[in-house]
C-alpha cells in the first residue's frame, strides 16, 4: 500500500498540488462502503441509512443529471472519504430564466480538517454551478462559518429562516 | 364584468373567506399574458422574457413534477395575477434521505399588498412542501422581511451568503 504522505506534504497536496493526497470526484454508489454515511452523520446525526435507501436516493439524484451534483474527497492512500458537499441548480423565471446554485451539506471528516479540503470541495461546487450557467451561488451557514465561506469567495447577503414540521 | 368587491370585503375574501377575490393556483402557460412577467419585474428588474423562453422554462419545471411548484394568485374579477411564489423540493442523503423545501421568488403586486396575499401564497407553498415529505422549509430574506415570514411560521436560523459570477 502507498505510504501516506507526511503531514506537510499532505497539506500541500490537499491544497491541490501534484500527487494529490485527496481526489475530489462525484459520489459513487460504492461510496456507501467508503465512509460516506459516517461523514453524513458528522453533519447531521441520524439513524443509519440502509444500502437500499442510499441506492434509491443516489439514482433519483442521478436522474437530475448535472442539476444536482454531490462531490466527495477521497483519500488517495486509503480510499476513504474525507469530505463531501452538494450543489443543486435552481431554474428560475427571474433574471431572464436565470439559474442559481444552492450549495448544501458541506462536511469535512473531523480527522481531516485544517487541510483545505472543505475549501477545495466548495470551490469545485461553485465552478460546477458556474458551468451550469448560474448567475450566483448561495449557501446558508451558521455565523461561525461565515469566515470560512468568505475565504471561498462568498459575501454575507440575507437572513435564512426555517419552518420545521 | 363582475363588479369588483368593495375593499373591506376584498380584504376578508383575500384572507381566504368565501367568494374569494383571489384564487391561488399553479402557474399556467397562459399566465404570460396575465401579468406574470410584470410581477417578476417587480421582484427582480430585468429585460423582458420572450414567450419562447417562458414556455421553455415552464416545460423544464413541469418536467420536475411536484418537486418544483410555482403558485400564482389570480384576481378573480380581472384574471390578472397579483402574487406569485415558488417552492423547490431538495432531495438529501442526510436525515435518512430527507427532503427540504426551498421557498423562492415570493412577490405581491405593489397594488395588491396589505391584503394577506403574500401570506396565503407562502402558506400554500409550505403545505406543498409538507405534502412532499419535507422535514423543513427554508427561505432567505432581507432583515426587513423577517417579521413577515415569522407571521408565516418561520424562525430565524442562519446566515445566507452569496457568490456572484
Curated annotation (Swiss-Prot), chains A, B:
Cellular-component GO terms for this entry: endoplasmic reticulum membrane
Main location: endoplasmic reticulum
Lineage: Eukaryota, Viridiplantae, Streptophyta, Embryophyta, Tracheophyta
Pfam family name, one: Acetyltransf_1
EC number, as in UniProt: 2.3.1.4
Catalytic activity reported: D-glucosamine 6-phosphate + acetyl-CoA = N-acetyl-D-glucosamine 6-phosphate + CoA + H(+)
N-acetyltransferase domain: residues covered: 22-165
UniProt-recorded Gene Ontology molecular function terms: glucosamine 6-phosphate N-acetyltransferase activity
Annotated acetyl-CoA binding sites: 114-119, 149-151
Ligand binding (substrate): 44, 92-95, 104-106, 135-136
Membrane topology label: Peripheral membrane protein
Name of the protein: Glucosamine 6-phosphate N-acetyltransferase 1
Disruption phenotype: Short roots, disruption of microtubules and shrinkage of cells in the root elongation zone.
Subunit field text: Homodimer.
Tissue specificity as recorded in UniProt: Highly expressed in the root elongation zone and at lower levels in leaves and grains.
Main EC class the enzyme belongs to: transferase
Compartment list: Endoplasmic reticulum membrane
A single BP term in Gene Ontology: root development
Coiled coil: none
Amino acid at each position: 500500500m502507498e505510504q501516506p504522505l507526511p503531514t506537510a506534504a499532505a497539506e500541500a497536496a490537499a491544497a491541490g498540488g501534484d500527487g494529490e493526497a485527496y481526489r475530489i470526484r462525484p459520489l459513487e454508489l460504492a461510496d456507501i462502503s467508503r465512509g460516506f454515511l459516517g461523514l453524513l452523520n458528522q453533519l447531521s446525526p441520524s439513524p443509519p441509512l440502509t444500502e437500499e435507501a442510499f441506492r434509491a436516493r443516489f439514482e433519483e439524484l442521478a436522474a437530475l443529471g448535472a442539476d444536482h451534483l454531490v462531490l466527495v474527497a477521497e483519500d488517495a492512500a486509503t480510499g476513504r472519504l474525507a469530505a463531501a458537499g452538494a450543489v443543486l441548480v435552481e431554474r428560475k423565471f427571474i433574471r431572464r430564466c436565470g439559474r442559481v446554485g444552492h450549495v448544501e451539506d458541506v462536511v469535512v471528516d473531523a480527522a481531516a480538517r485544517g487541510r483545505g479540503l472543505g475549501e477545495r470541495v466548495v470551490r469545485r461546487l461553485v465552478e460546477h454551478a458556474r458551468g451550469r450557467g448560474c448567475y450566483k451561488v448561495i449557501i446558508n451557514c451558521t455565523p461561525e462559518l461565515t469566515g470560512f465561506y468568505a475565504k471561498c469567495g462568498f459575501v454575507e447577503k440575507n437572513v435564512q429562516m426555517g419552518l420545521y414540521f
